[in-house]
Amino acid sequence: MSKRPTIAITSGEPAGIGPEISIRAAWELRADVKSILIGDAAFLAMTAAAINPAIRLSALSLQAVRNSGVPDFSRDQIAVIDCPLAAHVVPGKLDAQNGRYVLQTLDIGIEGAQQGWFDAIVTAPLQKSTINDAGVPFTGHTEYLADKTNTAQVVMMLATNATPQPLRVGLATTHLALKDVAAAITIDSLAGILDILLADLQNKFGIAKPRILVAGLNPHAGEGGYLGREEIEVITPVLQAAQAKGFDVRGPYPADTLFQQKYLEDADCVLAMYHDQGLPVLKYASFGLGVNITLGLPLIRTSVDHGTALDLAAAGLGQADHGSMLEAMRIAAQMAAAARTSS
């Protein structure tokens, strides 16, 4: 890349694998990405030294960045915006005292993206229970980012470049009980989701004319109404409205046949109706290299597709695979480049 994108990495739950995989990925991609870790500078420096003594971290104060922006630094350095821990970290052992610390790192990432310090945010995994135990109601990264940026509707996408061509799967619903899915899919909600997908595929992925395949909700896409009428009464009218505006959206297709190469090679994204309809295929195909992307935000955010892995953290450094973090950073960099071009 001619210009290294500046990417902030929130280091996640300090007792998990987030700090390690963040440092490893940032160091590996230092030639192509200007990485800014957000977390406790002393703790991250200690972790980096244990991973590889050659890794060089450069600490920045938040106030200095607010005053002057992110300074230039060499390609053999990783910057850290210091955000002090509340309590000593024991790998693999959660401490609610550090719950608010995790949110502070997110707040800095959001502030920096909105102020133009960063081109994108990549989030390492956090532990929801620790934040809730700290007295802060918290349901997840996505909801927190939406709330902090005053975004009414967001779309969860999983993506991977580990397949013959990029595979992107957007979700019409996310972490919702299966019995509640049908009621959650309305004409208004689905139209909004499709609008976000189309806009972000254009503006954040650089796809001028996105091609979207849409899955049905019911087996066999409803079998003409015999197995459910959501395809007839909700999904098809939304697709027809988008098609009337000139967009290439197709469906609804039976989900059990949609994920075939002959269909995917002629598409930029699949829209699945619920979590376990679309994600098993992607997770199987991605070989652990899936990336979680939040669309609809006024910033670029990607994340790993796994959790804090406290057991691996407790076992010591070198146990965790940082492949998903590498892909999250690469896709964030690609999106940042596309966003610069489209703006």
UniProtKB/Swiss-Prot annotation:
Cystine connections: none
GO cellular component: cytoplasm
Gene Ontology BP annotations: pyridoxal phosphate biosynthetic process; pyridoxine biosynthetic process
Reactions catalysed: 4-(phosphooxy)-L-threonine + NAD(+) = 3-amino-2-oxopropyl phosphate + CO2 + NADH
Keywords: Cobalt, Cytoplasm, Magnesium, Metal-binding, NAD, NADP, Oxidoreductase, Pyridoxine biosynthesis, Zinc
Any GO MF annotation of the entry: zinc ion binding
Residue numbers binding a divalent metal cation: 175, 220, 275
Essential cofactor(s): Zn(2+); Mg(2+); Co(2+)
Binding site for substrate: 141-142, 283, 292, 301
Enzyme nomenclature, EC number: 1.1.1.262
Cofactor info, note text: Binds 1 divalent metal cation per subunit. Can use ions such as Zn(2+), Mg(2+) or Co(2+).
Pathway stated in the Swiss-Prot or TrEMBL entry: Cofactor biosynthesis; pyridoxine 5'-phosphate biosynthesis; pyridoxine 5'-phosphate from D-erythrose 4-phosphate: step 4/5
Function: Catalyzes the NAD(P)-dependent oxidation of 4-(phosphooxy)-L-threonine (HTP) into 2-amino-3-oxo-4-(phosphooxy)butyric acid which spontaneously decarboxylates to form 3-amino-2-oxopropyl phosphate (AHAP).
NCBIfam families for this protein: pdxA (TIGR00557), PRK01909.1 (NF002520)
Annotated family: Belongs to the PdxA family.
Note: The active site is located at the dimer interface.
PANTHER family: 4-HYDROXYTHREONINE-4-PHOSPHATE DEHYDROGENASE (PTHR30004:SF5)
Oligomeric form and interacting partners: Homodimer.
Name of the protein in its database record: 4-hydroxythreonine-4-phosphate dehydrogenase
Organism, as annotated: Janthinobacterium sp. (strain Marseille)
